[in-house]
Amino acid sequence: MGAMRAGDPYDSGVQLGPLAMARQLERVEGYIAKGRDEGARLAVGGGRPTGLNRGYYIEPTLFINVDNSMTIAREEIFGPVLSLIPALDEADAVRIANDSPYGLNGAVFTGDPARAYAVARQVRTGNIAQNGFRMDMNIAFGGFKQSGVGREGGVEGLLPFLETKTLFLDAAI
């Protein structure tokens, strides 16, 4: 994560663009402060990148020594903040992942697609991918539980904009 470069999203060497607005930057910085206050250890990032004075940039941030009771593990941050929570085994990892009121996105990090599939079927998120996040506007995107308000993308994303009309006609017309 420390090697990720923040900057102009039109620059091909950049992996992380700015947040959308000042309010969101302040919100993410508040979560970073809360993580520190609650005892999580900052391993990478946590500040504003140097040299990016225009825009709402925050460094990719990794917390370790996180447990599932901490705010940074319980809430959707919507910023480049990752909380690494240790698990005893695969079943414990699934339990931790599902112990949340949210379920927008998840990832299973493994080189074994069959194992990724088996774990993904147990995790209650609207989207889950092997080895990281993926997005395709042709496929529905949205969450479970308290995450999101429906689906974006794909046929499912169009359905809320449609009205069904049933018309009955006599065959003789």
Kindly give the residue locations of the regions a language model identified.
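Conserved C-terminal structural/oligomerization subdomain of aldehyde/semialdehyde dehydrogenase
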Residues: 2-5, 16, 32, 37, ...
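Conserved donor-nucleotide binding/catalytic region of nucleotide-linked donor-dependent transferases
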Residues: 8
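Diglycine-centered glycine-rich loop/turn motifs
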Residues: 41-47
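Short beta-strand to alpha-helix junction loop
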Residues: 18-29
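Short linear capping/connector segments at secondary-structure termini
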Residues: 11-17
